[in-house]
């Protein structure tokens, strides 16, 4: 049986912390779908199409990773994609509480959908897209936390 995992997120923008999780998840599962959420309730810096394109370029070196945008309920999206595992990153205890609620709801909606939680490597454990954007807005150097093409796109957005 092929294990098709889905790693959903807003990825606004995709960071090296996300890539850490993506790379490790790609080595664990037959296929990994990087699902970029439309997130209409969030005020994103990058459009959905831009976030998908940035993620595609960031993950291009991983043969078993595909990238797609979505706006559906996660359980419905997973079912449509024939996904059987959700991958989520955990940085803090607060992340765990929220992710546990989501995992239980997703399991209720799609009983065959498992949630797997990965902790980022220590180097990326404090990174979030929001923090990176905030530091960049104040002219802080965030190049270490982003793939080079994403860093360039962020600088262009902030001009």
From Swiss-Prot:
Its cofactor is Mg(2+). It catalyses: (R)-4'-phosphopantetheine + ATP + H(+) = 3'-dephospho-CoA + diphosphate. InterPro entries: Cyt_trans-like (IPR004821), PPAT (IPR001980), Rossmann-like_a/b/a_fold (IPR014729). It comes from the Bacteria. GO terms for molecular function: ATP binding; pantetheine-phosphate adenylyltransferase activity. It is an enzyme of class 2 (transferase). Homohexamer. ATP binds at residues 10-11, 18, 89-91, 99, 124-130. Substrate binds at residues 10, 42, 74, 88. It is found in: Cytoplasm. PANTHER family: PHOSPHOPANTETHEINE ADENYLYLTRANSFERASE. GO terms for biological process: coenzyme A biosynthetic process. Pathway: Cofactor biosynthesis; coenzyme A biosynthesis; CoA from (R)-pantothenate: step 4/5. Its EC number is 2.7.7.3. This is Phosphopantetheine adenylyltransferase. Reversibly transfers an adenylyl group from ATP to 4'-phosphopantetheine, yielding dephospho-CoA (dPCoA) and pyrophosphate. Its main location: cytoplasm. It comes from Cronobacter sakazakii (strain ATCC BAA-894) (Enterobacter sakazakii). The lineage of its organism: Bacteria, Pseudomonadati, Pseudomonadota, Gammaproteobacteria, Enterobacterales. Belongs to the bacterial CoaD family. GO terms for cellular component: cytoplasm. Keywords: ATP-binding, Coenzyme A biosynthesis, Cytoplasm, Magnesium, Nucleotide-binding, Nucleotidyltransferase, Transferase. The keyword tRNA processing does not apply. The record marks 18 as: Transition state stabilizer.
